[in-house]
Amino acid sequence: MPSADQILFVNVTTTVAAAALTAAAAVSTTKSGSGNAARGYTDSDDDAGMGTEAVANISGSLVEGLTTVTAALSTAQADKDSAGECEGAVEELHASILGLQLAVPEWEALLTALVLSVIIVLTIIGNILVILSVFTYKPLRIVQNFFIVSLAVADLTVALLVLPFNVAYSILGRWEFGIHLCKLWLTCDVLCCTSSILNLCAIALDRYWAITDPINYAQKRTVGRVLLLISGVWLLSLLISSPPLIGWNDWPDEFTSATPCELTSQRGYVIYSSLGSFFIPLAIMTIVYIEIFVATRRRLRERARANKLNTIALKSTELEPMANSSPVAASNSGSKSRLLASWLCCGRDRAQFATPMIQNDQESISSETHQPQDSSKAGPHGNSDPQQQHVVVLVKKSRRAKTKDSIKHGKTRGGRKSQSSSTCEPHGEQQLLPAGGDGGSCQPGGGHSGGGKSDAEISTESGSDPKGCIQVCVTQADEQTSLKLTPPQSSTGVAAVSVTPLQKKTSGVNQFIEEKQKISLSKERRAARTLGIIMGVFVICWLPFFLMYVILPFCQTCCPTNKFKNFITWLGYINSGLNPVIYTIFNLDYRRAFKRLLGLN
């Protein structure tokens, strides 16, 4: 039996042969006229006409014969295709107590109807709750949730317009509602499912733009733009689903109850619709969610690093020794207070010495120190001076853009207060400079240590010059600090400063910052997990259906059973019931709105 390619070859051959015979007839007519004129025939026109008529008759006979052969081959191929289709589209019928003829046993029909009805009801309830939550719960009434509403509407139409007819068709094994309703049902099926998938793609793109370009996209994400994008989703879905209604199909002209009501298997449309409905959106969602996952993971790492540095929990970072740095002593009831002033200059790369919150040009640092209960620990070189532990809390504030750094220390004991302040200029090298060196000084104002509370404020103001500096005054006293002063290690008086993570005591501001950061990190971790669940569920639900949808028109020997096809089809439909769960169960506001709507508060 000839193949489709052979039939195409015969058709082309027929056309070429007909054209060649027509051309031969024209040439014959011309030659006949020329020859008769040369021989002086007076009835040359009649002879030429007879020759032309003969050639035309021969041509017509050949064309008719070739056309008959082509028609016969086409009919044979069609018969083969019909015979090659999966037989038993309607399997053995089973009688029911209601007098209906069912495609499956009655118990199986009841179980199928029960399970599928539960899926339909849950899908309807879930998507209605999503829609009502957005419009009735104020925290959810934001622009980006309009995409969720559009998705819920698409899934709701699937549950209302598509699934009930599919239940009846699956149980009865035949379509009892006529050809027009069959075509309308199939079109709604493609329209609603495509819209659901494209809405998932739009949600992915919205999240991607919000993460990669948050400032600009926040301005562009207006109600008008979001509604325009949603309208584009539904319009594109209509363009994908409507071509079969205007002729791009292989549906039979005569339709009976025994005729299967199935999606068209016209190969061109199958490729067109599968690309637009699934494979292109799948590629976009995969790329977008990978980018979102990478960006989220990078932000998590950056924030974790910033949280660690901003609480000054540095791990044994020892700064290089400073030349010409001399400790300054102040007495208080026989005890000593040692103060070392130095310059910490960040050079070209400020990030080597500054925390992320200091890297901005305009910030301030506030700190609060408390007296430890036991601070009589000897130094590493036999020095009996007590060591300090101090926690610095970073609070970002806007300042004037000029190069000026000041340090203020205030100590209160019995109503007495002392202050010390200094200024510095930027240096070009990454080093610690002496207190009395170029750029300023740090003068202690008679600081007294004691058993009271000490407050300190370190404010830094840097201009546009990236090479800023911070003057550091480290005091060894009875307070707690995270900065530990190592006494001079040689006779030259050179000292080193070690920053050691000791016991951390956070103030109220620091606790607030940490709590906000923990909440933010927790949200982003949940978002990253949600991305994996979204993609996993989407692929599991829809990939089997679209693989079957694409393969069957090109595989004449592939004959899956009706039960298998129904299972694969319903696996895709289940995605419409899972979408409201996936996109809302991880959101606290949606859970609160659901409880509020269901009266479970």
From Swiss-Prot:
Chief place of localization: membrane
UniProt cross-references to SMART domains, sorted A to Z: 7TM_GPCR_Srsx
Location(s), subcellular: Cell membrane
A matching Pfam family: 7tm_1
Keywords: Cell membrane, Disulfide bond, G-protein coupled receptor, Glycoprotein, Membrane, Receptor, Signal, Transducer, Transmembrane, Transmembrane helix
Compositionally skewed regions (Polar residues) per UniProt: 361-376
UniProt membrane topology term: Multi-pass membrane protein
Residue ranges, Cytoplasmic side: 136-145, 206-225, 296-530, 589-601
Tissue expr: Preferentially expressed in Drosophila heads.
Annotated region described as Disordered, given as residue ranges: 361-465
InterPro entries per record: GPCR_Rhodpsn, GPCR_Rhodpsn_7TM, Octopmn_rcpt
GO cellular component: plasma membrane
Compositionally biased spans, kind Gly residues: 436-453
Glycosylation sites: 11, 57
Family label: Belongs to the G-protein coupled receptor 1 family.
PANTHER family in UniProt: ADRENERGIC RECEPTOR-RELATED G-PROTEIN COUPLED RECEPTOR, TYRAMINE_OCTOPAMINE RECEPTOR
Protein name: Tyramine/octopamine receptor
Gene name tied to this protein: Oct-TyrR
